Amino acid sequence: SVALLGCGGGHTPLVPKANITGPTSKGSRAFAATPSVVDLTTVGYIEEEFFVEGTARAFKPDGAFGLDGKWSVLEASSTPYKTRILVRRPRDSSRFSGVVVVEWFNVSSKIDIDVDYHFVHDEILRSGHVWVGVTAQEISISSKGDGSLGKDALGLAAWDPARYGSLVHPGDSFSYD
């Protein structure tokens, strides 16, 4: 299961509502991401993948960007997207700690790599936390094996077209919702 958490109270949401489907079918290949550094089944965890779709927004400055990091922005445009998330969670929901760690996949090699998970997995697994990896950048969907890891390191759409061919990412300026 996936939960979207937010505050109640009759206010306008800061982010447009997303639709989540899944878990996805296995497809013709393994999940496209670096595998967990431990066998998840031996520690009572499972890995599932979900598709997330909705409307993403790009933003533009509303005035000058100051050095304090407190910037005001306006919505510049919006467009549909469909991406995926990878979830590693305790198989037994009673072990869930209530903490969800969300990682924006690193795409320096033009594919999804869970760099942070590699360093914090011991604590996540020991404590019963849920880890969610997010495909947040366009290149990890569209890469054709031209990254630093070579021709076999393909973006999602090329890795498994049957499973990932419907993913749509309008570009990195839409990555922040």
Residue ranges and their predicted role:
Residues A3-G6:
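C-terminal motif of bacterial Sec signal peptides marking the signal peptidase cleavage site
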Residues H11-H118:
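Catalytic-loop region of hydrolases
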Residues F105-S109, H121-D177:
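Cap/lid segment of the alpha/beta-hydrolase catalytic domain
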